Amino acid sequence: MTEIAIPNGVETLGNYAFYGCSALATVTLGTQERSSSSLKTIGDYAFAETAVKSVVLPNGVSTLGNYAFNKCASLATVSLGNSLTAIGDYAFSDCKKLESVTFGSALETIGERAFASAKISSLVLPAAVRTIGDWAFYNNPLTAITFNDGLQSIGSRAFYGVSVQTLNIPNSVTELGSYAFSGCKSLETVTIGTGVTKISDYAFNTCSALTQISCPSVTEIGASAFKGCSSLTDIPLNDKITSLGNYVFSGCSAIESLVIPNSVTSIGSYAFEKCTKLTSATLGTGISSIPDYMFSSCSALTSVVLPENITGIGKYAFQSTAFTELPLTASITEIKDYAFKSCTKLTSVAIPDRVTKLGTYVFQSCTGLESAKIGGGVTSVPNYMFHGCTNLVNVELSEKVTSIGNSAFYNCKGLKSLPVTESITSIGTNAFYGCTSLTSVHLSDQVTSLGASVFYGCSSLTEAVLGTGITTLGSSLFRNDAKLKKVVANGKIASVSTYTFNGCSSLERIYINNTPPTGASSNTFTKVPTSCRIYAPAQTCQFYAQTTYWKDFVIMPWLDELEIVSTTPSMSFDGGEALDVKPDTKTFVIEFNRTVVNTDSVSAMLIRSGFPVEDQVLTVSYSGNEVTVIREGKDLPNDPYYYLVLTTSDKQFSILFKVTTVTGIDEPVVEKEVRLREYYSVDGKLLPRPVQGINIVKTVYEDGSIEVSKVYVKPEDCRR
């Protein structure tokens, strides 16, 4: 069947009357005279999925059922009589060639998806229309829409994706559905009448050409209402607005400045996220906290003016902004997770005492940050607080801070000293992982908890001294610390773990103040040289020598560090002035704080005015806690600066004295004028300046004579 004429006298075409008649192309409904037709009702699916090309409804038809002409792929024109009051749901949906529709004067309601996915380019609504249903003109290529003054409701997605450039919504409209004009990529200007007080969720979402909007009576703008409106430069915020939904202006990348009026009392998360040209924002007094993600990824934002009543900053609120200083008011007491993550232009931050709640990751990846101060309002540096702050050098913690969280300073490559006060009792896992500028670690006895991998990858670390509170050395604690030479564990270490010293290829000494700890495995000491010495209490050394993994190293008794107690004759060993010693003194006795043993490896050198004294022979012996130095040679000539230098396996002592004689006449000394003086290392390399230790000095005088001598330079002389 390709053609059918419905005779006059038929009042109703039932549901599915010609449904699926795929060859039916021509339909005549009743008499050709529209005013005399008796047809009143066309049922659901009556002509759905037919090949009909044109539809003319007689004036008598008042009801057009749901799906009546749904998916009529050849339908191009429709004329609706003046009796039709409602178009059923999906009536002309998916009629992909439908370009022209003439509405009758009685039409009040356009049903859900009535013309969805049609090809209508222009729309003029008759005066009687009150309601446009959800999805009614979804994805039509509409370039012009004329709304009637009596229109009251525009449904959800009613004009989603249409091509209109200008919209004028009349004052009569009181309801604007969600997604109503979402995805209208050509829409530039919108005027919303006074009847609309709420712009629903996603109403103009991704209208990327939208530059201007007027909505004088609106008090509430819903979630994502203008999200992705990347050409919008002026935000429609007046002093009637009270509420802004989630993502409301997210991705509005043309906005440069923002003022939120005092009337706004509610702002959702992500409200201005990714407004990449926004440089300044002023917030009104209506809100008391910055919502989560409010300005996240506003990469040009440098200035925010906050009212004094703001008490909190939400999660990710200012992530990836361009702040150079923190926007903190006197009332802020809480900063939540990730609040300033990746703010790479921050160079210095100070958390005041009034802040009592700090979230995790607050300053993660702030790669420009150089200094930080944490006030006394918090007791802990939260987990991941400064994670990845690669240029952080100086950290000041309040004495009220008692713990450092997991990964708090992870990969802070610029950190040169440990920000640990006497108040710290706990340091979390990975706290200083990858802090490659740390050279030494000294933890007080107050620290009782030390997590795994705390100093993993601290490649410049040479020394670590742990207080008496530490009783466990966790997994990977010093892993891959390739320059680490010395670890002193003053506490009663009960256990070590896998990888504790793994990769410590320069380790020379480990001090363990206990019997062999449990937990060592084949991975604990990987790459630690077998020449490394394990210092343990004397009574435990035999057990170390018999314990797997520990016995692979040199076991030594742990003795107190040598310190000078007194000298005979009296000499200065504590930085005082030089004391007189007789020129014929042959014996020097130095008393230490403990017994001197072979492994202390004591040696001696006599220095006069910076030069080693070559005509003197020194012999060193020790007994108990005394070291005796016997001098063989001529009497010592007058000089105000002699140093008896004692060197041990751990340190060096410089003992100062002077020699003066009250009788005898010194021969006059004729000073020769120096032409050139050069310094060499002991292996003959020319030096730009004297260095610590022994230097070879070549002096050329004006008379042509040359003098070569050895000079001993103290560390403090190098610093001068």
Region roles according to the model:
Residues 1-12, 22-41, 50-63, 73-86, ...:
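Structural signature of tandem-repeat unit edges
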Residues 14-19, 43-46, 65-70, 88-93, ...:
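Consensus positions within tandem repeat domains that build extended binding/scaffold surfaces
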Residues 559-572, 660-686, 718-719:
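Residue-level detector of functionally pivotal "anchor" positions at catalytic/ligand-binding pockets or at interdomain
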Residues 562-603:
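Solvent-exposed, low-complexity, repeat-rich "mucin-like" stalks and linkers
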Residues 573-579, 608-624:
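Low-complexity "stalk/linker" and mucin-like segments enriched in Ser/Thr/Pro/Ala/Gly
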Residues 631-640, 689-691:
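Surface-exposed, short loops/turns at beta-strand junctions within beta-sandwich domains
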Residues 653-661, 709-711:
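C-terminal edge beta-strand
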Residues 696-720:
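C-terminal tail/sorting-segment detector
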